[in-house]
């Protein structure tokens, strides 16, 4: 991507480019930081790079926004980094889906939105505020192009739509908690009549679980369908997040007396699990939320997030849900819609169209829980959040109990390592 950005800068002598990254990436993923640093240091002086550390300890900047000339913007779940490329087919052994070293990359499911007009301008305002907060520099609003910007080959799904922009921002310094995304999620769940459809990398947010649980307890409440990855990207992440997911699934299943709850992971034609990184909630055919926010506590009140939302009877909303599920099930959209019309139930439609041998959806089963996972789930050390009542702790991030528990976890790890060394040096006869 660096070579592409450099080429664009060379082609457009007046272009200024601003790259803003979370400062925690220096520690968490230093390799992903190097391309941006290289562009800034060795590239054009019109490429400006900054690290943003204005967040509580342990939090991160998770918004995924690209804006151009105040007139075009992307907002969604896709990071501008490696190993994110794939097609909707998620073909097995696709030679184009490779890592930097040439090794195969796993199938990846992600979603973003593109927009022009006032919505793009509002996202530009948000981005300039983020830059000013990080650097102290106020960027001028650029002149709007005479002609609208829209990439060739990108289909338009709707025109003249009213878009809401929702944020999560943790309390920090003199800033109070902003939990617009959580509030919109809860309002949408409460208003649902027929179906709540969710795609998310995680499924651990307590407030969302409580809201879904209340709807499943109702005699005539909505169906709830969740699409998640089968497993996390590391064993530690599995322990930190998917033990919590176990607990959420157990709670929802315990109140699901009408058999209206399902949680799946997608597979391709070779039965490879497709990693789900998309962040979407669609309620009935009237509300869609799409952006950077997962269904976890961090996204509700600890990290910075940005979603866009659309509300109202709109073909775009129903078509998006049909397109996503038709993709996961490996069928055409028309076939999916006809089956849904016949059943009038999303779960029944999935049951009929789901293939056990080809591309399809598989039920997520409870994972075994180890000691580390139980500690992380009990403390929510890796999935913490602020609530509106906790502004007094703004800027402190991890609480003292979390620091103590990190020390305990490190001690457990060291003891385990010493035991492993002892066993290697004293094998059983």
Regions found by a protein language model. Give the residues of each.
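Charged, low-complexity intrinsically disordered terminal segments
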Residues: 1-429
């Amino acid at each position: 991507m660096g070579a592409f950005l450099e080429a664009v800068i060379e082609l457009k002598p007046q272009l200024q480019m601003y790259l803003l990254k979370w400062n925690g990436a220096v520690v968490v993923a230093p390799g992903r930081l190097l391309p941006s640093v290289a562009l800034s240091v060795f590239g054009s002086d019109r490429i400006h790079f900054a690290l943003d550390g204005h967040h509580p300890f342990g939090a991160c900047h998770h918004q995924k926004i690209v804006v151009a000339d105040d007139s075009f913007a992307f907002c969604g779940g896709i990071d501008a980094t490696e190993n994110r490329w794939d097609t909707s087919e998620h073909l097995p052994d696709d030679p184009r889906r490779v890592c930097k070293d040439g090794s195969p990359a796993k199938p990846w499911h992600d979603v973003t939105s593109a927009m022009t007009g006032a919505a793009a301008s509002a996202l530009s305002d948000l981005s300039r505020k983020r830059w000013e907060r990080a650097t102290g520099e106020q960027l001028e609003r650029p002149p709007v192009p005479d002609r609208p910007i829209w990439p060739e080959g990108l289909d338009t799904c709707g025109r003249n739509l009213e878009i809401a922009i929702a944020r999560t921002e943790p309390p920090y310094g003199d800033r109070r908690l902003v939990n617009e995304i959580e509030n919109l999620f809860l309002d949408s769940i409460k208003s649902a009549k027929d179906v709540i459809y969710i795609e998310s990398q995680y499924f651990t947010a307590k407030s969302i679980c409580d809201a879904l649980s209340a709807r499943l307890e109702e005699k005539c409440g909505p169906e709830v369908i969740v699409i998640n990855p089968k497993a996390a990207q590391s064993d530690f992440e599995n322990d930190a997040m998917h033990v919590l997911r176990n607990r959420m699934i157990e709670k929802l299943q315990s109140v699901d007396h009408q058999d209206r709850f399902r949680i799946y992971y997608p597979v391709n034609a070779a039965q490879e699990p497709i990693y789900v990184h998309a962040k979407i909630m669609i309620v009935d055919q009237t509300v869609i939320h799409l952006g950077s926010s997962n269904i976890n506590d961090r996204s509700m009140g600890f990290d910075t997030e940005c979603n866009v939302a659309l509300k109202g009877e709109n073909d775009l909303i129903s078509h998006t849900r049909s397109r996503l599920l038709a993709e996961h099930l490996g069928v055409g959209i028309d076939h999916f819609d006809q089956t849904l019309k016949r059943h009038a139930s999303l779960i029944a439609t999935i049951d009929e169209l789901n293939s056990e041998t080809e591309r399809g959806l598989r039920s997520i089963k409870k994972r075994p829980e180890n000691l580390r996972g139980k500690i992380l789930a009990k403390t929510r050390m890796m999935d913490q959040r602020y609530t509106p009542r906790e502004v007094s702790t703004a800027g402190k991030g991890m609480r003292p109990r979390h620091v103590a528990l990190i020390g305990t976890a490190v001690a457990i790890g060291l003891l385990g390592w010493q035991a492993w060394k002892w066993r290697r040096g004293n094998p059983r006869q």
